[in-house]
């Protein structure tokens, strides 16, 4: 009788924990979807040259958009004071200004929405003691990263308000990289709550070895994302619009024309695009190799599915990247390429989770 009662209590506790974990995981995945949208909107904001249209940072008051004609005139006048207007958009009409303003406004508004969607459930779960100390620490860490991302966004915008017509490529890349880190943290915690144990028929040592390979690939994809941030930051995609060669060269001659030499990796259009291409080539060889190795093991169906999706997303992303380059970075394909980077990264994270 005591044994039966013990099992009943244990079952109730287990079911309650499972429900809590499922709720938290769904909430985190919703936040992931919002961050995905944020990355895409941020990419469009950059591609349309809209990022400097709002020259102030007002986290609360800035939520209210301009309503009257006077409000719009004030905002346009503030924009006229920065170098980008003087050197690129001089003579811009109010209607033209509205076109770039709304992209930056929605980008910031989406950032505020993400903060709200994360903060309110986070406080609820903590107050109701739905999370243990370990999980609570992870969720708090993600919240702190989100706050830092808001500061990083404004720090990036500041770099284009005084002396430059565009934001710093260093700060842009840091802003993009931090978005991917936040996304990865939420996705990893969520998938861990949904599927804490993986069952494979394959030899555990072989699965661990494949898992190490997957983590290396994920790191390489993240590194490629950072490289893409530099490409975007210095508009390197507008040059060398040929493939597979760079205007007739596999290794172009202008790779190290800047001094000191290390500046070329960040400021030289030729070198920055070359680096991005080389990382892409490396992934084009290593991910299919990983896929073939995974096929040789008896993985779970979800593990096999994750590996298939990784290969599919690689092919999709390569096609989008080449098309974007050949067409000199059109808005639609460039935005799709940035979205593809998130999806490729997601597939790699899921593979790592399935092999962990």
Curated annotation (Swiss-Prot):
Q: Could you tell me the membrane topology recorded for this protein?
A: Multi-pass membrane protein
E.C. number: 1.17.99.9
Q: Name one GO cellular component term.
A: plasma membrane
Q: Which UniProt keywords apply?
A: Cell membrane, Heme biosynthesis, Iron, Membrane, Metal-binding, Oxidoreductase, Transmembrane, Transmembrane helix
The transmembrane residues are 24-44, 106-126, 139-159, 174-194, 216-236, 272-292, 309-329, 331-351
Cell location: Cell membrane
**Quaternary context:** Interacts with CtaB.
| Catalytic function, reaction form | Fe(II)-heme o + 2 A + H2O = Fe(II)-heme a + 2 AH2
Any idea what this protein is called? Heme A synthase
Q: What does this protein do?
A: Catalyzes the conversion of heme O to heme A by two successive hydroxylations of the methyl group at C8. The first hydroxylation forms heme I, the second hydroxylation results in an unstable dihydroxymethyl group, which spontaneously dehydrates, resulting in the formyl group of heme A.
Q: Which BP terms from GO are recorded?
A: heme A biosynthetic process
Quote the InterPro entries the UniProt record gives.
Answer: COX15/CtaA_fam, HemeA_Synthase_type2
Q: In which pathway does it act?
A: Porphyrin-containing compound metabolism; heme A biosynthesis; heme A from heme O: step 1/1
Q: What class of enzyme is it?
A: oxidoreductase
Which co-factors does it depend on? heme b
């Amino acid at each position: 009788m005591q044994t039966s009662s013990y099992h009943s209590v244990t079952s109730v506790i287990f079911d309650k924990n499972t429900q809590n974990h499922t709720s938290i995981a769904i909430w985190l995945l919703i936040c992931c979807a919002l961050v995905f949208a944020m990355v895409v909107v941020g990419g469009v904001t950059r591609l349309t040259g809209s990022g400097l249209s709002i020259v102030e940072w007002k986290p609360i008051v800035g939520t209210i958009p301009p309503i009257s004609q006077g409000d719009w005139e004030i905002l346009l006048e503030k924009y006229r004071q920065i170098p980008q207007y003087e050197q690129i958009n001089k003579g811009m009409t109010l209607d033209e200004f509205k076109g770039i303003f709304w992209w930056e406004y929605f980008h910031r508004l989406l950032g505020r929405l993400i903060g709200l969607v994360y903060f309110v459930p986070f406080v609820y779960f903590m107050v109701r003691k739905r999370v243990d100390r370990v999980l609570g620490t992870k969720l708090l860490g993600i919240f702190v990263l989100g706050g830092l991302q808001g500061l990083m966004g404004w720090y990036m915008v500041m770099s284009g308000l005084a002396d430059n017509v565009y934001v710093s490529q260093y700060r842009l890349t840091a802003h993009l990289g931090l978005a991917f880190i936040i996304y990865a943290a939420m996705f990893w915690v969520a998938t861990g709550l949904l599927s804490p144990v993986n069952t494979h028929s394959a030899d555990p040592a072989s699965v661990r070895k494949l898992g190490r390979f997957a983590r290396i690939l994920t790191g390489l994809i993240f590194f490629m994302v950072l490289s893409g941030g530099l490409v975007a930051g210095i508009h390197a995609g507008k040059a060398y619009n040929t493939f597979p060669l760079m205007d007739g060269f596999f290794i172009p001659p202008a790779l190290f024309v800047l001094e000191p030499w290390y500046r070329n990796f960040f400021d030289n259009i030729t070198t920055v695009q070359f680096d991005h291409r080389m990382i892409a080539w490396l992934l084009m060889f290593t991910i299919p190799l990983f896929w073939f190795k995974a096929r040789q093991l008896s993985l779970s169906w979800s593990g096999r599915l994750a590996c298939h999706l990784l290969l599919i997303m690689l092919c999709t992303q390569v096609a989008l990247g080449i098309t974007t380059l050949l067409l000199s970075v059109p808005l639609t394909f460039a935005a799709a390429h940035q979205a593809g980077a998130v999806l490729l990264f997601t597939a790699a994270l899921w593979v790592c989770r399935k092999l962990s």
